[in-house]
Amino acid sequence: MRKTVLVLLALGCGIGIGGSAYGTTKGLSQIVTPDLQSAGDLSLSFQAQNMKIGNPYELQGELGLTKWAEVAVFKGFKPNELIFGTEFGLLQKEPWLLSAGFVSWSPHSHIDPQPYLEAGYWSEHHKVIVGAIHVGYRNEAILGYAYDFNKKWRAQVDFQSGSGNSSTLGITWNITDDFQMNPALYVTNDKPHDILGYVVFTYTFHLWNKEKARDNEKAGAE
């Protein structure tokens, strides 16, 4: 659920189109990812996107509670709404990951939570995601792939089946160890296959994960 992308936190998974899954702050562009936010890390994000993707302006927060659980909150402005998500790590032994949770629960907008199950293969450079999500009355497939060139640059693609969703192509740029930017293009599943823009900026605070914060400071000094 990282993110990216959340991304964001889904307090990632990009994370969605038309009320579908929201990527989180450290996941891919559209979908939730099966890797969890580190315990004690709080990621805050600002997201801007085409209105056909979802709420055009959002604030996001994603908090790692333990090594196997995280929560996410999304604050939208047009319309004014709060969206909740959570993720639980059923298996977190890299390279193999298995996670479950829900995204896109908006009591204010009377939108029910959308449960999902995802498996991932997480190596140093290659990240592969396969899963499914239940949206309303239907089940939708989730697919994603990312390639980490180094600690600063990642290229990523993802797909969620169903009307109102998209295929996406994006990058993640880790400007510093704690600040990142993720721009992406969405190509809608529905004809005429519109191309839509999306960008999210994320900063991560290490609330009670001080050891990781010190490691980041040392890496930056080097």
Please tell me what each predicted stretch does.
Residues M1-T4:
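Positively charged n-region of N-terminal signal peptides that target proteins for export
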Residues A21-P115, G120-H126, Y145-G162, S166-E222:
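Transmembrane beta-barrel domains of Gram-negative outer membranes and organellar outer membranes
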Residues N139-G144:
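General zinc-binding finger modules coordinated by cysteine/histidine
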Residues L6-L8, S29:
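Short helix-onset patch at the extreme N-terminus, typifying the N->h transition
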Residues H134-G136:
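Surface loop/turn motifs at the tips and blade-to-blade linkers of beta-strand repeat domains
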Residues L8-G16:
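Bacterial N-terminal signal peptides
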